[in-house]
């Protein structure tokens, strides 16, 4: 399973990239707004840091507007992937963009049939949201398993990006469920690095080494 970082914060992206574990970035209007900077300016800087898929989202809710925005975003860099919301107008836009060779990531997926429709419309990626399903008492991992099974049975090449990932357990379960990618907040990536026994082991090694050199 590949790992993307889910942020628009340049420092977080730089730090995550230095770890050598990420191969893509996802952003959304909320994450961009937090940075208080121009959308294109932020995206251009991200593309200079990470050599991999960079998702930028449209804000229009009608097909014509989505397609227009998508074409402009796609011009920023060859690695751009256009995030399109799951809705009828979004599917129309995805189909048009697919025919033009523009990659898309259909977001806000909450059911396997939504993912199937997005894939058949020509989506390069689908993004099921785990945490938000957990919030309403559903099991996000069942959704990942269902999408993965459907895509495998029917030979669908659309990749699954598990989104709304909130903790290391989510990441573990995504990998086991067959997700192609997990897009993870920077703070969760840092949580994944740590384990109490690892920290204790490092501390013991250092103490033993110091004892040898006294």
Curated annotation (Swiss-Prot):
<feature type="active site" description="Schiff-base intermediate with substrate">
    <location>
        <position position="83"/>
    </location>
</feature>
<keyword id="KW-0704">Schiff base</keyword>
<comment type="pathway">
    <text>Carbohydrate degradation; pentose phosphate pathway; D-glyceraldehyde 3-phosphate and beta-D-fructose 6-phosphate from D-ribose 5-phosphate and D-xylulose 5-phosphate (non-oxidative stage): step 2/3.</text>
</comment>
<protein>
    <recommendedName>
        <fullName>Probable transaldolase</fullName>
        <ecNumber>2.2.1.2</ecNumber>
    </recommendedName>
</protein>
<keyword id="KW-0808">Transferase</keyword>
<dbReference type="InterPro" id="IPR013785">
    <property type="entry name" value="Aldolase_TIM"/>
</dbReference>
<comment type="function">
    <text>Transaldolase is important for the balance of metabolites in the pentose-phosphate pathway.</text>
</comment>
<dbReference type="InterPro" id="IPR018225">
    <property type="entry name" value="Transaldolase_AS"/>
</dbReference>
<dbReference type="GO" id="GO:0005737">
    <property type="term" value="C:cytoplasm"/>
</dbReference>
<keyword id="KW-0570">Pentose shunt</keyword>
<dbReference type="GO" id="GO:0004801">
    <property type="term" value="F:transaldolase activity"/>
</dbReference>
<comment type="similarity">
    <text>Belongs to the transaldolase family. Type 3B subfamily.</text>
</comment>
<dbReference type="Pfam" id="PF00923">
    <property type="entry name" value="TAL_FSA"/>
</dbReference>
<keyword id="KW-0963">Cytoplasm</keyword>
<dbReference type="InterPro" id="IPR001585">
    <property type="entry name" value="TAL/FSA"/>
</dbReference>
<dbReference type="InterPro" id="IPR004731">
    <property type="entry name" value="Transaldolase_3B/F6P_aldolase"/>
</dbReference>
<dbReference type="InterPro" id="IPR022999">
    <property type="entry name" value="Transaldolase_3B"/>
</dbReference>
<dbReference type="GO" id="GO:0005975">
    <property type="term" value="P:carbohydrate metabolic process"/>
</dbReference>
<dbReference type="GO" id="GO:0016832">
    <property type="term" value="F:aldehyde-lyase activity"/>
</dbReference>
<dbReference type="InterPro" id="IPR033919">
    <property type="entry name" value="TSA/FSA_arc/bac"/>
</dbReference>
<dbReference type="GO" id="GO:0006098">
    <property type="term" value="P:pentose-phosphate shunt"/>
</dbReference>
């Amino acid at each position: 399973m590949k790992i993307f970082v889910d942020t628009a914060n340049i420092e977080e992206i730089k730090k995550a990239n230095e770890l050598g574990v990420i191969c893509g970035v996802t952003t959304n209007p909320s994450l961009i707004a937090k940075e208080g900077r121009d959308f294109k300016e932020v995206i251009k800087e991200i593309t200079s840091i990470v050599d991999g898929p960079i998702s930028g989202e449209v804000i229009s809710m009608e097909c014509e507007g989505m397609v227009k925005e998508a074409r402009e975003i796609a011009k920023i860099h060859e690695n751009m992937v256009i995030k399109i919301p799951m809705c009828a107008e979004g599917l129309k836009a995805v189909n048009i963009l697919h025919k033009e060779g523009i990659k898309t990531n259909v977001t806000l997926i909450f059911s396997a049939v939504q993912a199937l429709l997005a894939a058949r419309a020509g989506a390069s990626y689908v993004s099921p949201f785990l945490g938000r399903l957990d919030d309403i008492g559903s099991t996000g991992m069942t959704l990942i398993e269902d999408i993965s099974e459907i895509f495998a049975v029917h030979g669908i090449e659309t990749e699954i990006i598990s989104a709304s990932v909130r903790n290391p357990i989510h990441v573990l379960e995504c990998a086991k469920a067959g997700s192609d990618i997990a897009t993870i907040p920077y703070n969760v990536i840092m949580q994944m690095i740590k384990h109490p026994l690892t920290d204790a082991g490092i501390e013991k090694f250092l103490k033993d080494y110091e004892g040898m050199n006294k």
